Amino acid sequence: YTWSVFHDVEGLIDLFGSDQKFTIKMDSVFTLPSTIKPGTYGGVIHEMKEMELAGMGQYAHGNQPIQHMPYLYCYAGQPWKTQYWVRQIVERLYNSTEKGYPGDEDQGGMSSWYILSSLGIYAVCPGTDEYVIGSPLFKKATITMENGNKFVIEAPENSKENLYIQSATLNGRLLDKNYIHYDDIAEGGVLKFEMGSQPNKERCTSKYAAPFSLSKE
């Protein structure tokens, strides 16, 4: 539960000491061996086995409390790592076979993560109106609201290789933040991504671009 500070990621970063120390710790989650310690469970439960089979270090997507974690790079100046890991999870852990669902469906968390992340957005912090930017899976997707408004997400160059966001616009204006608001979707419009095969390490790396944290308010 180290990462479960949804309301104040900036405060969590401060406890680590710096953005760099925070992201190094995040990197380690994906690179440590996928070893299992049953602990008080007394045996290996399915979430542990699913983590081992996924082969993403200690990242256990089948256990919902960590599903927001790949998006936290957007708070620490490395959004391209969010883009990389979100696409890895979407493409490697979900598919249309009997093995294509990486865990159980607690309160709709597993499927809603996929739906939102495949669109290129995710609601990290409950109680805010922000959706953090990830990496869209599709070249074009349209969300039709109840009132008939349409929010279109476009990524014409998108492909398995072109998973990194080079630039983004919202209704024709440069999007220089790692998030959009619910009203942007509800009112309708166009979110357009320029995609590429290499990360743009200059885009949206400042604290200005980071999503909501209580420590920033």
Label the predicted regions.
Residues Y1-V152, E157, D183, V190:
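Active-site core of glycosidic bond-cleaving carbohydrate-active enzymes
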Residues E146, L170-R173:
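Short strand-turn-strand beta-turns centered on an Asx-Gly dipeptide
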Residues P156, R173, G196:
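Surface loops and adjacent helix of pleckstrin homology
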Residues E161-S167:
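Beta-strand-rich binding/interaction modules
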Residues D176-H181:
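Short, solvent-exposed S/T- and G/P-enriched segments that are highly enriched in secreted/extracellular
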Residues Y182-E217:
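C-terminal beta-strand-rich structural cap/linker in extracellular carbohydrate-active enzymes
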